[in-house]
Amino acid sequence: MSVKHFIQITKPGIIFGNVLSVAGGFFLASKGHVDFALFLAVVIGTSLVVASGCVFNNCIDRDIDIKMERTKNRVMVQGGMSLTLALVYATLLGVAGFSLLYVQANPLSAFCALIGFIVYVGFYSLWLKRKSVHGTLVGSLSGAMPPVIGYCAVSNSFDLAAVTLLVMFSLWQMPHSFAIAIFRFKDYSAANIPVLPVARGILAAKKQIVLYVLAFVLATLMLTLGGYAGLGYLAVAAAMGLYWLYMAWGGYKAEDDSKWARKVFGFSILTVTALSVMMGVDSQTAADVLMTYAR
């Protein structure tokens, strides 16, 4: 056991991705008036909560991970850390993260983090991932919480913008996850995980990817239409979203499903990164947007 194991078991890549969306939500609510001490507390607090969830997930999934090529070398599978130590580590990370959000931000942001944590660890990891084709849908709620946490940490209000962020990022999770399940089809089949491509076929997953990307594109526009983001954000959201939709539609004539799914997955990362950046740098009040339209 080494320091490396303590880092690896938290899934740093997932933490980094969540930090980007936290920042997007935070700067969207800040509207150019950034409290950097609060920002640091929210980023660290959310990262600790996400890390805690990932460690718990590693503990829960160790019987599944050993059957999958991409996860067979994880810390818990390889015996790099005892179950007891991992559970204690996960608990300490969670307590630290929730406490930091509650004390340094506000109870609302801590509550949003708690909801995401319960959905991911309790409903998704412990239950639905193994039992239901709808596990991805339920799990998407946890993946959508980080930008909401960032937004609510500043606004201290669960308003239309917070709802829009929750819907946007939940919708984004679906085609992103289905694409992974397609190019990792053998892994999920070997572990008997009922993701949509395995349970109902790749064609069914392709149809769902197109529908969810379309819904995502429409949802992204609501930040500008609702008066929370500017026209620069709108242009980027529309361009990225429509190209992602075009790419998703191409799945119907793809000769290599795995190659196509990897492209859809890769562009999903670019899309959510671009939107997180743009909603942070091009946030506006409703009055600002109305004045822009009126000119």
Curated annotation (Swiss-Prot):
<feature type="transmembrane region" description="Helical">
    <location>
        <begin position="135"/>
        <end position="155"/>
    </location>
</feature>
<keyword id="KW-0808">Transferase</keyword>
<keyword id="KW-0997">Cell inner membrane</keyword>
<feature type="transmembrane region" description="Helical">
    <location>
        <begin position="230"/>
        <end position="250"/>
    </location>
</feature>
<dbReference type="InterPro" id="IPR044878">
    <property type="entry name" value="UbiA_sf"/>
</dbReference>
<dbReference type="GO" id="GO:0005886">
    <property type="term" value="C:plasma membrane"/>
</dbReference>
<feature type="transmembrane region" description="Helical">
    <location>
        <begin position="9"/>
        <end position="29"/>
    </location>
</feature>
<keyword id="KW-1003">Cell membrane</keyword>
<keyword id="KW-0812">Transmembrane</keyword>
<feature type="transmembrane region" description="Helical">
    <location>
        <begin position="83"/>
        <end position="103"/>
    </location>
</feature>
<feature type="transmembrane region" description="Helical">
    <location>
        <begin position="108"/>
        <end position="128"/>
    </location>
</feature>
<dbReference type="InterPro" id="IPR030470">
    <property type="entry name" value="UbiA_prenylTrfase_CS"/>
</dbReference>
<keyword id="KW-0350">Heme biosynthesis</keyword>
<protein>
    <recommendedName>
        <fullName>Protoheme IX farnesyltransferase 2</fullName>
        <ecNumber>2.5.1.141</ecNumber>
    </recommendedName>
</protein>
<feature type="transmembrane region" description="Helical">
    <location>
        <begin position="36"/>
        <end position="56"/>
    </location>
</feature>
<dbReference type="InterPro" id="IPR000537">
    <property type="entry name" value="UbiA_prenyltransferase"/>
</dbReference>
<dbReference type="InterPro" id="IPR006369">
    <property type="entry name" value="Protohaem_IX_farnesylTrfase"/>
</dbReference>
<feature type="transmembrane region" description="Helical">
    <location>
        <begin position="264"/>
        <end position="284"/>
    </location>
</feature>
<dbReference type="GO" id="GO:0048034">
    <property type="term" value="P:heme O biosynthetic process"/>
</dbReference>
<keyword id="KW-0472">Membrane</keyword>
<dbReference type="GO" id="GO:0008495">
    <property type="term" value="F:protoheme IX farnesyltransferase activity"/>
</dbReference>
<feature type="transmembrane region" description="Helical">
    <location>
        <begin position="163"/>
        <end position="183"/>
    </location>
</feature>
<comment type="function">
    <text>Converts heme B (protoheme IX) to heme O by substitution of the vinyl group on carbon 2 of heme B porphyrin ring with a hydroxyethyl farnesyl side group.</text>
</comment>
<comment type="similarity">
    <text>Belongs to the UbiA prenyltransferase family. Protoheme IX farnesyltransferase subfamily.</text>
</comment>
<dbReference type="Pfam" id="PF01040">
    <property type="entry name" value="UbiA"/>
</dbReference>
<comment type="pathway">
    <text>Porphyrin-containing compound metabolism; heme O biosynthesis; heme O from protoheme: step 1/1.</text>
</comment>
<feature type="transmembrane region" description="Helical">
    <location>
        <begin position="209"/>
        <end position="229"/>
    </location>
</feature>
<keyword id="KW-1133">Transmembrane helix</keyword>
